[in-house]
Curated annotation (Swiss-Prot):
InterPro entries: Integral_membrane_TerC, Integral_membrane_TerC_rswitch. The lineage of its organism: Bacteria, Pseudomonadati, Pseudomonadota, Alphaproteobacteria, Rickettsiales. The keyword Transmembrane helix applies. This is Uncharacterized membrane protein RF_1252. It comes from Rickettsia felis (strain ATCC VR-1525 / URRWXCal2) (Rickettsia azadi). It is found in: Cell membrane.
């Protein structure tokens, strides 16, 4: 029943998104982007309340912790998506269409990764320690790397697509595929969609281990993942500016990853409750936001 409720909510949001709000190809304004993202955030928070009343406070805390971590870890994804759109010269009026269909892929591929990860961890518990090492290493690396980059032309995926598929040199309106001389040709819109899906899988390799350190409940992990990503896609059109403004969030995220990594190593000796993980996550993110605001004000003045 819980899965039916979740997928009903997601289906309704997707129909509202593309079928009503963005039925025509138009560029989303900054204000619309913020309002739509806030709408998704409220829905995600309400789903946490659903957890609270149906499965208890502990599950609700785990859900909110997973949601915040996934939200923070997905920020770099925005920069890579922006690079892809710039490379293929995708106009703003078509970007939302690509992001929308990208969500469909995310819903499918994240389900496979999370379900597969749960099976592996239940069978090989020691995998969590490998995840812990990855998280600590990623956290330390985050201190020294500004943003993740993506060399499109030299990527294996791009080379494979160009080599094996018929590609149109230019966009064909909002179409992903066109037919010419009884042959299918794929447009730059399609290639950008495939690359965005591939990049999401790469970023998921970083974020999903962090979530498994909080809980091994598939429903909590999956729902928090999807709601976090839905909100970020809605905020894409203004997020680059916001992330630049909150430049210290990456350091908060680095500390969160290191904290989660150590939490895995010590869980046999000290059990850290879900509410502590939630408090640590919120506190570190708030420190990052406040420090960024103070820094921005000092630079402006």
């Amino acid at each position: 029943m819980s899965w039916i409720i979740f997928y009903t909510v997601i289906a309704a949001l997707l129909v509202l998104d593309l079928g009503i709000v963005h039925k025509k190809n138009t560029v989303m304004s900054f204000k619309e982007s913020v309002l739509f993202s806030l709408f998704y955030f409220v829905i995600a928070c309400l789903f946490g309340i659903y957890f609270y009343y149906n499965t208890g406070a502990e599950h609700a805390r785990e859900y909110y912790t997973c949601f915040l971590i996934e939200k923070a870890m997905s920020l770099d994804n925005i920069f890579v998506i922006s690079i892809i759109f710039q490379f293929f010269k995708i106009p703003g009026k078509y970007q939302h269409r690509v992001l929308f269909f990208g969500i469909i892929g995310v819903i499918i591929f994240r389900a496979i990764m999370i379900y597969g990860g749960t099976i592996l961890i239940n069978k090989f518990a020691w995998l969590l320690y490998i995840f812990a090492v990855i998280l600590i290493a990623t956290g330390i690396k985050t201190f020294y790397v500004s943003h993740k980059t993506f060399d499109i032309q030299n990527s294996y995926i791009y080379k494979s697509i160009v080599k094996n598929l018929n590609i149109t040199p230019n966009l064909e309106g909002d179409k992903f595929v066109v037919k010419r001389n009884n042959k299918l040709y794929f447009t730059p819109l399609f290639i950008s969609l495939v690359l965005i899906e591939a990049i999401d899988l790469v970023f998921a390799i970083d974020s999903i281990p962090a979530i498994f350190a909080i809980t091994n409940d598939v429903y909590i992990i999956y729902t928090s993942n999807i709601f976090a990503i839905l909100g970020l896609r809605a905020l894409f059109f203004c997020l680059a500016e916001i992330v630049e403004r909150f430049s210290y969030i990456k350091y908060s995220l680095a500390l969160i990853l290191i904290f989660i990594g150590f939490k895995i190593f010590i869980h046999h000796y000290i059990a850290i409750p879900a509410y502590v993980s939630l408090i640590v996550t919120i506190t570190l993110l708030l420190f990052g936001i406040i420090a960024s605001i103070i820094r921005k004000n000092m630079i402006d003045h």
